[in-house]
Each structure stands twice: as C-alpha cells, then as structure tokens.
C-alpha cells in the first residue's frame, strides 16, 4: 500500500509552498479512502512518494486515470494568497491503494 503525490514543476512553487500543497493533497485523498485500506496502509508504514508532473494537463490526465481505476484521489488548487494565482492546480495525491494499482498510473514519473 502506498500513496503517490504528483506536484507540478512548471509553476515555480517555492519549497515551502510545494511542501504545503503535497500535504494538502495527501490529506485530501486520505479522507476519501475506505477504512480498511487506511488501516492496511497505516499498518504497512504509510508509504508516501512525491513525484513530478510537468503541466496542469498532465495533472488532470493522471487524476482522471486514477478515478477511472477507482482509486482515491485528492486534487489541490491553490488559494492564491502567496505565490500563485487563485485556483492554480498544484498537486494530486493517488491512494492509499495497492502499490501495483498506483504504479500503473504514476510508475513512469520521476521522483521529486
């Protein structure tokens, strides 16, 4: 079991902004995960992996692919209070879910 969080590289987020957006996405997807999967994920150490996506379009494509596969997702758009325009999509979490299921959607992405 793992969760993969994809963050955009094309919008110039600072390190703090990146960390916050990844955290928001992780928690958002977690909230939509069934209790049994959450227990298993926690028992296995709550693995989280952060990867790169190069565009808004790619973020949305991965989100739709995960939804079609029945995986929990959390797609985050920034509030626009600091670095980004309001509503800018920043990060997508997929899972927690079985490793192989998440890897089908994110396995080709580079680590952050």
Curated annotation (Swiss-Prot):
Matches recorded under InterPro entries: Pep_tRNA_hydro_II_dom_sf, Pept_tRNA_hydro_arch, PTH2
Chain intervals for the UniProt region annotation (Disordered): 64-99
Compartments, record wording: Cytoplasm
Example GO BP: translation
Enzyme Commission number(s) from the entry: 3.1.1.29
Keyword Hydrolase tagged: yes
Catalysed reaction, written as an equation: an N-acyl-L-alpha-aminoacyl-tRNA + H2O = an N-acyl-L-amino acid + a tRNA + H(+)
UniProt family annotation: Belongs to the PTH2 family.
Name by which UniProt lists this protein: Peptidyl-tRNA hydrolase
């Amino acid at each position: 079991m793992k969760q993969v969080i994809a963050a955009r590289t094309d919008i110039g987020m600072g390190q703090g902004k990146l960390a916050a957006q990844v955290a928001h996405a992780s928690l958002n997807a977690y909230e939509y995960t069934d209790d049994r999967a959450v227990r298993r994920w926690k028992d296995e150490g709550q693995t989280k992996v952060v990867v790169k996506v190069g565009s808004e379009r790619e973020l949305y494509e991965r989100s739709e692919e995960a939804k079609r596969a029945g995986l929990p997702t959390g797609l985050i758009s920034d509030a626009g209070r600091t670095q980004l325009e309001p509503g800018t999509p920043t990060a997508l979490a997929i899972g927690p879910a079985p490793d192989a299921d998440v890897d089908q959607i994110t396995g080709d992405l580079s680590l952050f």
